[in-house]
Amino acid sequence: MTVLDIGAWDGFFSFEAERRGAKRVLATDSFCWGGEGWGTKAGFELARKALNSRVEDMEIDVLDICRDKVGVFDIVLFLGVLYHMRHPLLALERVFSVTGNQLILETHVDMLLTEGPVMKFYPGAELANDPTNWWGPNPVAVETMLKTVGFRSVKIVSQWPVVPYKVGKGVRLKIKKHWPFFQKIQQSRMVFHAWR
């Protein structure tokens, strides 16, 4: 089995894939490793040395990823990256092009109470005070985008936190920080699996 970890940063999931028996693992990043972001590649290098790992690395932007540059992988990890992309559908097209079998995608989601596919746009630092957070798709939008770029099957495998917790947190934030109650209960994080 081969694994591509897009947006690997410190490589936690890359090294875990290797530990679990992947014969080839390629970790990629550009935002953190290239100095543009707030992270660096130092943690990845330290872990690779400490683990005596054979995980490969490549500094490459998501939008530059293609078969010619990285190859095709059985499993592609795209964890915590989608909502940072200025062009999310184009990013998913690139991800699809190098996925041999399965994509595992984790992302921030918003507008959970909206039935159709929609995405919330965050100009500035509206989401978590981070100016690199651009989008909050709802689950239907994520599924629709994945199918639009070519994945034949998509499944939500994890969503958190559960509704009672979200309502309690929303009330607490409303009281303490005067944050909009409904905004908080409409946001979450989800994991999707998609197959070619």
Where are the regions a protein language model picked out?
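A structural micro-motif
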Residues: M1, K23, S53-V55, N101-Q102, ...
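Conserved class I S-adenosyl-L-methionine
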Residues: M1-W9
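Conserved Rossmann-like nucleotide-binding pocket used by diverse enzymes
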Residues: L4, L26, E56-M58, L77, ...
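Long alpha-helical scaffolds
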Residues: A8, S14-A17, A22, A91, ...
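Class I SAM-dependent methyltransferase SAM/SAH-binding core
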Residues: F12-E59, D64
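S-adenosyl-L-methionine-dependent methyltransferase catalytic module, highlighting the catalytic core
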Residues: L63-K69, F73, L77-F78, R86-R196
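Conserved SAM-binding site of S-adenosyl-L-methionine-dependent methyltransferases, i.e.
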Residues: L82
